[in-house]
């Protein structure tokens, strides 16, 4: 990326500083998903043949498995580490496996090239890193909303089940830190269900705002593409 602008190698400290891969490797699932969609788009435009599309999609599937492969290796060598330790080990292993990767986009390009050769470079046709990161971030937020929403729904269902089991049990309500009139325990629990429903509606609205694709917008002027806005 830098070689086209500078005649001398970058200072080592600056080179490490400008790399975002140690952080944005977490966007691997989203980068792969966006790359698959783009592969279908350029195949529809005649840039990839059907065989090339199949090879590209299969290669991307293998790249997407990298973190799982590292997780299996870590478990095999050190037993079953706790969640935080395991994530740190996976992160260190992934970053160390691609010291030359500038960012998640470059990482996928390098790993896909290992899998399918020069064909991987065709995937760069008609897209820029600007739109790639914009797409990845929207997918990441959307996936996070889905995960959070599922958790909230499960929590609400648990509260409803618990409320149904309390029967006519009562408890004191509180106002200004002082006990007030008695209320049903079920009603107190269901009040939290109402709060969860409010949060779910907000997440639903946020997801709708996230759910469009900025692909084909390029660095500044848009370029025509069947995927734009979908």
What is each model feature region?
Residues 1-75, 82-222, 226-229:
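A helix-coil-helix interface module used to build multimeric assemblies
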């Amino acid at each position: 990326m830098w070689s086209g602008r500078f005649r001398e190698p970058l200072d080592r400290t600056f080179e490490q500083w400008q790399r975002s891969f140690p952080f944005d490797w977490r966007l691997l699932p989203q980068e792969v998903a966006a790359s698959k969609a783009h592969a279908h788009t350029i195949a529809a435009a005649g840039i990839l043949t059907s065989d090339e599309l199949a090879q590209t999609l299969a290669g991307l599937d293998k790249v997407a498995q990298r973190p799982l492969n590292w997780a299996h290796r870590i478990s095999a060598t050190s037993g079953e580490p706790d969640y935080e330790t395991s994530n740190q080990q996976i992160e260190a292993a992934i970053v160390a496996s691609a010291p030359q990767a500038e960012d998640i986009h470059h990482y996928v390009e390098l790993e896909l090239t290992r899998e399918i050769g020069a064909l991987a470079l065709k995937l760069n046709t008609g897209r820029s890193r600007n739109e790639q990161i914009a797409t990845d971030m929207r997918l990441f937020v959307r996936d996070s909303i889905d995960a959070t929403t599922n958790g909230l729904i499960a929590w609400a269902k648990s509260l409803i089940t618990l409320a149904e089991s309390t029967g006519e049990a009562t408890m004191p309500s509180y106002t200004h830190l002082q006990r007030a009139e008695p209320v049903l325990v079920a009603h107190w629990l269901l009040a939290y269900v109402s709060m969860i429903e409010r949060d779910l509606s907000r997440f639903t609205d946020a997801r709708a705002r996230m759910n469009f694709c900025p692909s084909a917008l390029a660095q500044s002027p848009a370029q025509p593409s069947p995927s734009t806005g979908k």
